[in-house]
């Protein structure tokens, strides 16, 4: 095994590991001992990318579950993102922009963090404090359900009430969309938060409420959200 102290990709990305090698640091012998394991890991990643299968990656029922996240950047039929699916998302975004005042995403783990990361990158912490013009008409965005935090739910609900009062001269009802995200449809934290917001919004004359559930659409799965 030979090392050039630098890895250069065609994209121009350069990883310089010169200072990682040497006395008191990583030795060539250390990496040589790991070569077989690294080759095995490389083969597993290549298999996952080509077939969508990963060793011992199972659903809750014990059956193999496909792993397709490596295909997300490639927009084509047969991949998670297709021209048709992306157009649906764009149409959905246009609908939210023109019809919805606030969106509350409800999920645990990846169902929570995936959207939250995109929000933090694209919008930032001051988004919900901006006026409609600065938000270019897009709704305010909130996240809940990552844990059973009644205080956090109440804080978001109070903020929705605040904005609904300030929107009253412009429109009779403040439109809220709830988006519970759970493949099984039975995630406790997600359902608890969803029920809280759904009941709180429907009890008030200030709100119109819509629900868009992200869940398993297979009737045999029996998702309560479907």
Region spans (language model):
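Extended, charge-enriched "interface" segments that sit outside catalytic cores
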Residues: 1-97
